[in-house]
Amino acid sequence: MENYIVLPKTADQTLLAKYYSLADVFTICSKRENFPTTCVEAQCCGTPVVGFDTGGTKETSIVPQDDFVCYGDIDGLAEKVKDKFCKSFKNIAEKAQKEYSKETMTKRYMETYDRGGRKERILLIDVNCKGSSTGKIVYDLYTNLRADGRTAAICYGRGENIEEENVYKFGLDWETNIHAGLSRITGYNGYFSYFSTKRLIKYIEKFNPDLIHIHELHAYFVNIKPLIEYIKAKNIPVVWTFHCEYMYTGKCGHAYECKNYQHECGDCPAVKGYPKSLWFDKTRQMFEMKKNLLGNWKFTIVTPSHWLADRVKTSFLKNKDIVVIHNGIDTNVFHPVDASDLKKELKIPGDCKLVLAVAPNIMSESKGGKWVLKLAEKMKNENVFFVLVGAL
Protein backbone atom coordinates (compact mmCIF):
# COMPACT_ATOMS: atom_id res chain seq x y z
CA MET A 1 0.00 0.00 0.00
CA GLU A 2 1.30 3.45 -0.94
CA ASN A 3 1.99 5.88 1.90
CA TYR A 4 0.79 8.87 -0.11
CA ILE A 5 -2.12 10.20 -2.12
CA VAL A 6 -2.08 12.88 -4.85
CA LEU A 7 -5.26 14.96 -5.03
CA PRO A 8 -6.44 17.52 -7.61
CA LYS A 9 -6.08 21.23 -7.05
CA THR A 10 -8.97 23.01 -5.38
CA ALA A 11 -10.09 26.61 -5.09
CA ASP A 12 -12.30 25.74 -2.10
CA GLN A 13 -10.62 27.61 0.75
CA THR A 14 -12.78 25.92 3.39
CA LEU A 15 -11.57 22.54 2.14
CA LEU A 16 -7.97 23.78 2.13
CA ALA A 17 -8.34 24.87 5.76
CA LYS A 18 -9.41 21.32 6.57
CA TYR A 19 -6.36 19.88 4.81
CA TYR A 20 -4.06 22.21 6.74
CA SER A 21 -5.79 21.48 10.06
CA LEU A 22 -5.60 17.74 9.45
CA ALA A 23 -1.84 17.73 8.90
CA ASP A 24 0.83 17.32 11.55
CA VAL A 25 3.47 18.97 9.33
CA PHE A 26 3.29 21.03 6.15
CA THR A 27 6.19 20.73 3.71
CA ILE A 28 7.18 22.88 0.74
CA CYS A 29 9.67 21.62 -1.85
CA SER A 30 9.44 24.29 -4.55
CA LYS A 31 12.47 25.18 -6.65
CA ARG A 32 11.96 28.86 -5.86
CA GLU A 33 9.36 30.85 -3.91
CA ASN A 34 9.29 34.51 -2.95
CA PHE A 35 6.80 34.26 -0.10
CA PRO A 36 4.58 31.16 -0.38
CA THR A 37 1.08 31.83 0.90
CA THR A 38 0.50 28.12 1.48
CA CYS A 39 3.05 28.16 4.33
CA VAL A 40 1.19 31.05 5.92
CA GLU A 41 -2.18 29.34 5.53
CA ALA A 42 -0.86 26.14 7.11
CA GLN A 43 0.48 27.93 10.18
CA CYS A 44 -2.73 29.92 10.60
CA CYS A 45 -4.42 26.51 10.84
CA GLY A 46 -1.94 25.43 13.54
CA THR A 47 0.42 23.33 11.41
CA PRO A 48 4.22 23.86 11.51
CA VAL A 49 6.18 24.20 8.27
CA VAL A 50 9.38 22.61 6.98
CA GLY A 51 10.88 22.57 3.50
CA PHE A 52 13.63 23.58 1.13
CA ASP A 53 15.35 26.93 1.72
CA THR A 54 14.67 28.40 -1.71
CA GLY A 55 14.06 32.12 -1.81
CA GLY A 56 11.75 33.56 0.82
CA THR A 57 10.29 30.28 2.08
CA LYS A 58 11.86 30.28 5.53
CA GLU A 59 10.72 33.86 6.16
CA THR A 60 7.17 32.52 6.40
CA SER A 61 7.98 30.46 9.50
CA ILE A 62 6.55 31.72 12.80
CA VAL A 63 8.64 29.20 14.74
CA PRO A 64 12.12 30.70 15.37
CA GLN A 65 13.95 27.52 14.38
CA ASP A 66 15.87 26.68 11.23
CA ASP A 67 13.37 24.27 9.72
CA PHE A 68 14.51 24.59 6.12
CA VAL A 69 17.23 22.62 4.35
CA CYS A 70 19.13 23.00 1.08
CA TYR A 71 17.23 22.25 -2.12
CA GLY A 72 17.15 18.49 -2.71
CA ASP A 73 18.34 17.48 0.77
CA ILE A 74 15.75 14.75 1.40
CA ASP A 75 17.68 13.22 4.31
CA GLY A 76 17.79 16.57 6.09
CA LEU A 77 14.13 17.24 5.33
CA ALA A 78 13.09 13.86 6.75
CA GLU A 79 14.87 14.72 9.99
CA LYS A 80 13.09 18.09 10.16
CA VAL A 81 9.73 16.35 9.70
CA LYS A 82 10.44 13.83 12.45
CA ASP A 83 11.63 16.60 14.74
CA LYS A 84 8.31 18.39 14.27
CA PHE A 85 6.39 15.22 15.16
CA CYS A 86 8.04 15.28 18.60
CA LYS A 87 7.09 18.85 19.51
CA SER A 88 3.98 20.82 20.37
CA PHE A 89 2.97 24.04 18.62
CA LYS A 90 0.00 25.25 20.64
CA ASN A 91 0.37 28.97 19.90
CA ILE A 92 1.46 28.81 16.28
CA ALA A 93 -2.02 29.54 14.87
CA GLU A 94 -2.56 32.57 17.11
CA LYS A 95 0.85 34.03 16.26
CA ALA A 96 0.45 33.40 12.53
CA GLN A 97 -3.03 34.91 12.41
CA LYS A 98 -1.80 38.07 14.11
CA GLU A 99 1.16 38.49 11.75
CA TYR A 100 -0.41 37.34 8.49
CA SER A 101 -4.01 38.56 8.55
CA LYS A 102 -5.25 40.50 5.55
CA GLU A 103 -6.11 43.33 7.95
CA THR A 104 -2.48 43.57 9.09
CA MET A 105 -1.32 43.53 5.47
CA THR A 106 -3.77 46.27 4.49
CA LYS A 107 -2.75 48.45 7.44
CA ARG A 108 0.89 48.26 6.36
CA TYR A 109 0.00 49.06 2.76
CA MET A 110 -2.11 52.04 3.83
CA GLU A 111 0.83 53.37 5.84
CA THR A 112 2.90 53.14 2.66
CA TYR A 113 0.21 54.74 0.50
CA ASP A 114 -0.29 57.63 2.92
CA ARG A 115 3.24 58.96 3.02
CA GLY A 116 2.76 62.65 2.38
CA GLY A 117 -0.96 62.51 3.11
CA ARG A 118 -3.94 60.18 3.05
CA LYS A 119 -4.83 58.77 -0.36
CA GLU A 120 -8.58 58.47 -0.84
CA ARG A 121 -8.78 56.98 -4.33
CA ILE A 122 -6.68 53.84 -4.87
CA LEU A 123 -6.59 51.90 -8.13
CA LEU A 124 -5.19 48.35 -8.04
CA ILE A 125 -3.89 46.60 -11.17
CA ASP A 126 -3.21 42.87 -11.47
CA VAL A 127 -3.43 39.99 -13.91
CA ASN A 128 -6.32 38.50 -11.94
CA CYS A 129 -8.98 39.26 -9.35
CA LYS A 130 -9.83 36.71 -6.65
CA GLY A 131 -8.69 33.72 -8.72
CA SER A 132 -4.96 33.50 -7.92
CA SER A 133 -2.62 34.22 -5.01
CA THR A 134 -2.04 37.80 -6.18
CA GLY A 135 -5.68 38.15 -7.21
CA LYS A 136 -6.77 37.26 -3.68
CA ILE A 137 -4.37 39.83 -2.23
CA VAL A 138 -5.70 42.52 -4.57
CA TYR A 139 -9.30 41.73 -3.68
CA ASP A 140 -8.52 41.71 0.05
CA LEU A 141 -6.89 45.14 -0.29
CA TYR A 142 -9.89 46.42 -2.25
CA THR A 143 -12.31 45.16 0.43
CA ASN A 144 -10.36 46.56 3.37
CA LEU A 145 -9.67 49.91 1.70
CA ARG A 146 -13.40 50.34 1.17
CA ALA A 147 -14.01 49.38 4.81
CA ASP A 148 -11.60 52.19 5.74
CA GLY A 149 -13.83 54.68 3.93
CA ARG A 150 -11.72 54.99 0.80
CA THR A 151 -12.71 54.59 -2.83
CA ALA A 152 -10.93 51.58 -4.32
CA ALA A 153 -10.99 50.05 -7.79
CA ILE A 154 -9.51 46.92 -9.34
CA CYS A 155 -8.43 46.67 -12.97
CA TYR A 156 -7.48 43.14 -14.03
CA GLY A 157 -6.61 41.43 -17.27
CA ARG A 158 -7.57 37.77 -17.07
CA GLY A 159 -10.22 35.54 -15.52
CA GLU A 160 -13.96 35.62 -15.03
CA ASN A 161 -15.96 38.84 -15.32
CA ILE A 162 -16.77 40.06 -11.80
CA GLU A 163 -19.82 42.25 -11.36
CA GLU A 164 -18.86 44.43 -8.40
CA GLU A 165 -18.54 48.17 -7.97
CA ASN A 166 -15.30 49.54 -9.46
CA VAL A 167 -14.06 46.06 -10.44
CA TYR A 168 -13.17 46.13 -14.14
CA LYS A 169 -11.79 43.46 -16.44
CA PHE A 170 -10.01 45.44 -19.14
CA GLY A 171 -8.30 42.46 -20.76
CA LEU A 172 -9.85 41.04 -23.92
CA ASP A 173 -9.50 37.25 -23.97
CA TRP A 174 -9.00 37.05 -27.72
CA GLU A 175 -6.25 39.66 -27.52
CA THR A 176 -4.57 37.82 -24.64
CA ASN A 177 -4.43 34.70 -26.83
CA ILE A 178 -2.93 36.69 -29.70
CA HIS A 179 -0.41 38.29 -27.30
CA ALA A 180 0.67 34.85 -26.07
CA GLY A 181 1.11 33.61 -29.63
CA LEU A 182 3.04 36.68 -30.77
CA SER A 183 5.29 36.40 -27.71
CA ARG A 184 6.20 32.84 -28.63
CA ILE A 185 6.86 33.82 -32.25
CA THR A 186 8.74 37.11 -31.77
CA GLY A 187 10.42 36.55 -28.40
CA TYR A 188 8.88 39.76 -27.02
CA ASN A 189 6.41 39.68 -24.12
CA GLY A 190 4.58 42.61 -22.58
CA TYR A 191 4.69 44.38 -25.96
CA PHE A 192 1.22 43.64 -27.33
CA SER A 193 -2.44 43.84 -26.12
CA TYR A 194 -2.96 47.24 -27.77
CA PHE A 195 -6.74 47.43 -27.28
CA SER A 196 -6.71 46.01 -23.74
CA THR A 197 -4.09 48.55 -22.72
CA LYS A 198 -6.14 51.38 -24.25
CA ARG A 199 -9.14 50.19 -22.20
CA LEU A 200 -7.05 50.21 -19.02
CA ILE A 201 -5.70 53.72 -19.64
CA LYS A 202 -9.21 54.97 -20.39
CA TYR A 203 -10.44 53.57 -17.06
CA ILE A 204 -7.53 55.15 -15.17
CA GLU A 205 -8.37 58.49 -16.80
CA LYS A 206 -12.01 58.17 -15.73
CA PHE A 207 -11.31 56.95 -12.17
CA ASN A 208 -8.67 59.64 -11.54
CA PRO A 209 -6.77 57.85 -8.74
CA ASP A 210 -4.70 59.50 -6.03
CA LEU A 211 -2.39 56.48 -6.21
CA ILE A 212 -2.00 53.37 -8.37
CA HIS A 213 -0.95 50.08 -6.81
CA ILE A 214 0.48 47.74 -9.46
CA HIS A 215 0.94 44.02 -8.88
CA GLU A 216 1.73 41.58 -11.72
CA LEU A 217 2.05 42.81 -15.31
CA HIS A 218 3.21 39.63 -17.01
CA ALA A 219 0.93 36.92 -18.50
CA TYR A 220 0.20 38.44 -21.91
CA PHE A 221 -2.54 40.91 -20.98
CA VAL A 222 -1.02 44.40 -21.15
CA ASN A 223 1.49 46.49 -23.10
CA ILE A 224 3.85 47.60 -20.34
CA LYS A 225 5.62 50.56 -21.94
CA PRO A 226 2.63 52.75 -22.95
CA LEU A 227 0.92 52.02 -19.62
CA ILE A 228 3.90 53.18 -17.56
CA GLU A 229 4.57 56.12 -19.86
CA TYR A 230 0.98 57.27 -19.35
CA ILE A 231 1.24 56.97 -15.56
CA LYS A 232 4.54 58.86 -15.57
CA ALA A 233 3.14 61.62 -17.79
CA LYS A 234 0.19 62.06 -15.41
CA ASN A 235 2.56 62.07 -12.41
CA ILE A 236 0.39 59.59 -10.50
CA PRO A 237 2.11 58.16 -7.38
CA VAL A 238 2.77 54.43 -7.69
CA VAL A 239 3.31 51.60 -5.24
CA TRP A 240 4.38 48.46 -7.09
CA THR A 241 4.37 45.05 -5.40
CA PHE A 242 6.94 42.69 -6.91
CA HIS A 243 5.60 39.18 -6.43
CA CYS A 244 8.41 37.87 -8.63
CA GLU A 245 11.53 39.09 -10.46
CA TYR A 246 9.95 39.84 -13.84
CA MET A 247 10.30 43.63 -13.81
CA TYR A 248 14.08 43.70 -13.42
CA THR A 249 15.00 40.71 -15.59
CA GLY A 250 14.76 40.33 -19.33
CA LYS A 251 11.73 38.09 -18.92
CA CYS A 252 12.13 35.68 -16.03
CA GLY A 253 9.82 35.57 -13.04
CA HIS A 254 12.48 33.60 -11.20
CA ALA A 255 16.12 34.14 -12.15
CA TYR A 256 17.27 31.25 -9.92
CA GLU A 257 21.07 31.16 -9.98
CA CYS A 258 21.42 33.33 -13.09
CA LYS A 259 22.98 36.73 -12.37
CA ASN A 260 22.70 38.24 -15.85
CA TYR A 261 20.07 40.71 -14.61
CA GLN A 262 22.70 42.35 -12.39
CA HIS A 263 24.39 43.81 -15.47
CA GLU A 264 22.55 42.96 -18.71
CA CYS A 265 20.32 40.12 -19.83
CA GLY A 266 20.91 38.31 -23.11
CA ASP A 267 21.88 34.80 -24.21
CA CYS A 268 19.15 33.71 -21.81
CA PRO A 269 19.55 30.16 -20.45
CA ALA A 270 15.78 30.04 -19.85
CA VAL A 271 14.59 31.47 -23.16
CA LYS A 272 12.22 28.53 -23.69
CA GLY A 273 10.80 28.79 -20.17
CA TYR A 274 7.81 30.95 -19.25
CA PRO A 275 7.18 33.40 -20.82
CA LYS A 276 8.26 31.21 -23.69
CA SER A 277 9.96 32.09 -26.97
CA LEU A 278 10.09 29.42 -29.65
CA TRP A 279 12.98 30.88 -31.63
CA PHE A 280 14.27 34.34 -30.71
CA ASP A 281 16.09 35.57 -27.62
CA LYS A 282 14.94 39.16 -27.07
CA THR A 283 15.85 39.31 -23.38
CA ARG A 284 18.53 41.97 -23.93
CA GLN A 285 16.05 44.27 -25.67
CA MET A 286 13.37 43.69 -23.02
CA PHE A 287 15.88 44.25 -20.24
CA GLU A 288 16.93 47.58 -21.78
CA MET A 289 13.30 48.61 -22.23
CA LYS A 290 12.56 48.01 -18.55
CA LYS A 291 15.77 49.70 -17.43
CA ASN A 292 15.07 52.81 -19.52
CA LEU A 293 11.41 52.88 -18.51
CA LEU A 294 11.87 52.40 -14.76
CA GLY A 295 15.42 53.48 -14.03
CA ASN A 296 14.89 57.22 -13.45
CA TRP A 297 11.27 57.02 -12.32
CA LYS A 298 10.38 57.62 -8.68
CA PHE A 299 8.07 54.95 -7.28
CA THR A 300 7.90 52.64 -4.26
CA ILE A 301 8.61 48.92 -4.56
CA VAL A 302 7.02 46.52 -2.10
CA THR A 303 8.24 42.94 -1.77
CA PRO A 304 6.59 40.21 0.33
CA SER A 305 9.95 38.99 1.66
CA HIS A 306 13.32 40.38 2.72
CA TRP A 307 14.91 37.82 0.41
CA LEU A 308 13.22 39.35 -2.64
CA ALA A 309 14.01 42.87 -1.41
CA ASP A 310 17.67 41.89 -1.30
CA ARG A 311 17.42 40.59 -4.86
CA VAL A 312 15.91 43.88 -6.05
CA LYS A 313 18.86 45.68 -4.43
CA THR A 314 21.24 43.81 -6.76
CA SER A 315 19.35 45.02 -9.86
CA PHE A 316 19.11 48.33 -11.73
CA LEU A 317 16.29 49.22 -9.29
CA LYS A 318 18.59 49.13 -6.26
CA ASN A 319 18.19 52.84 -5.50
CA LYS A 320 14.40 52.77 -5.32
CA ASP A 321 12.38 53.07 -2.13
CA ILE A 322 11.91 49.39 -1.14
CA VAL A 323 9.47 48.26 1.56
CA VAL A 324 8.80 44.71 2.82
CA ILE A 325 5.16 43.84 3.53
CA HIS A 326 4.25 40.20 4.10
CA ASN A 327 1.29 38.79 2.21
CA GLY A 328 -1.90 38.50 4.25
CA ILE A 329 -4.68 35.91 4.14
CA ASP A 330 -8.28 35.56 5.28
CA THR A 331 -7.94 34.33 8.87
CA ASN A 332 -11.71 33.95 9.07
CA VAL A 333 -11.20 30.96 6.77
CA PHE A 334 -7.70 29.80 7.66
CA HIS A 335 -7.80 28.80 11.32
CA PRO A 336 -7.82 25.41 13.10
CA VAL A 337 -10.96 23.45 12.18
CA ASP A 338 -12.28 19.94 12.78
CA ALA A 339 -11.10 17.77 9.88
CA SER A 340 -11.97 14.31 11.25
CA ASP A 341 -14.51 13.76 8.47
CA LEU A 342 -11.85 14.49 5.84
CA LYS A 343 -9.50 11.95 7.39
CA LYS A 344 -12.20 9.29 7.10
CA GLU A 345 -13.02 10.34 3.55
CA LEU A 346 -9.37 10.01 2.49
CA LYS A 347 -9.12 6.65 4.33
CA ILE A 348 -6.01 7.71 6.23
CA PRO A 349 -5.15 5.29 9.07
CA GLY A 350 -6.09 6.89 12.38
CA ASP A 351 -2.70 6.43 14.05
CA CYS A 352 -0.62 7.85 11.17
CA LYS A 353 1.19 11.14 11.28
CA LEU A 354 0.24 13.23 8.26
CA VAL A 355 2.53 15.36 6.08
CA LEU A 356 0.80 17.77 3.69
CA ALA A 357 2.03 19.57 0.57
CA VAL A 358 -0.14 22.04 -1.36
CA ALA A 359 0.73 23.92 -4.54
CA PRO A 360 -0.87 24.75 -7.89
CA ASN A 361 0.38 22.19 -10.41
CA ILE A 362 2.24 20.50 -7.59
CA MET A 363 3.83 17.82 -9.79
CA SER A 364 5.58 20.41 -11.97
CA GLU A 365 9.34 20.88 -11.84
CA SER A 366 9.02 24.26 -10.14
CA LYS A 367 6.57 23.18 -7.41
CA GLY A 368 8.51 20.08 -6.39
CA GLY A 369 5.95 17.32 -6.04
CA LYS A 370 8.60 14.80 -7.05
CA TRP A 371 10.62 15.75 -3.97
CA VAL A 372 7.62 15.17 -1.72
CA LEU A 373 7.24 11.69 -3.24
CA LYS A 374 10.94 11.06 -2.64
CA LEU A 375 10.40 12.12 0.97
CA ALA A 376 7.48 9.67 1.18
CA GLU A 377 9.73 6.92 -0.17
CA LYS A 378 12.42 7.86 2.34
CA MET A 379 9.91 7.57 5.20
CA LYS A 380 7.99 4.52 3.92
CA ASN A 381 8.92 2.48 6.99
CA GLU A 382 7.70 5.22 9.32
CA ASN A 383 4.08 5.51 10.44
CA VAL A 384 3.59 8.54 8.19
CA PHE A 385 1.12 9.32 5.41
CA PHE A 386 1.61 12.03 2.76
CA VAL A 387 -1.13 14.08 1.11
CA LEU A 388 -0.27 16.16 -1.98
CA VAL A 389 -2.90 18.64 -3.15
CA GLY A 390 -2.68 20.46 -6.48
CA ALA A 391 -2.45 17.96 -9.33
CA LEU A 392 -3.76 19.20 -12.68
Features from the language model and the residues they span:
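Aromatic "clamp/platform" in nucleotide-sugar-dependent glycosyltransferases that forms part
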Residues: 31
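Short hydrophobic beta-strand element within catalytic cores of glycosyltransferases
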Residues: 48-51
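Nucleotide-activated donor-binding/catalytic signature segment of Leloir-type glycosyltransferases, i.e.
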Residues: 1-10, 383-392
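Conserved acidic donor-binding segment of nucleotide-sugar-dependent glycosyltransferases
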Residues: 63-74, 82-86
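Short alpha-helical donor nucleotide-sugar binding micro-motif in glycosyltransferases
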Residues: 18-23
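A charged, aromatic-enriched C-terminal amphipathic alpha-helix characteristic of glycosyltransferases
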Residues: 86-117
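A short helix/loop element that forms part of the nucleotide-sugar donor recognition site in Leloir-type
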Residues: 335-348
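Conserved donor-binding/catalytic core segment of Leloir-type glycosyltransferases
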Residues: 348-367, 373-376
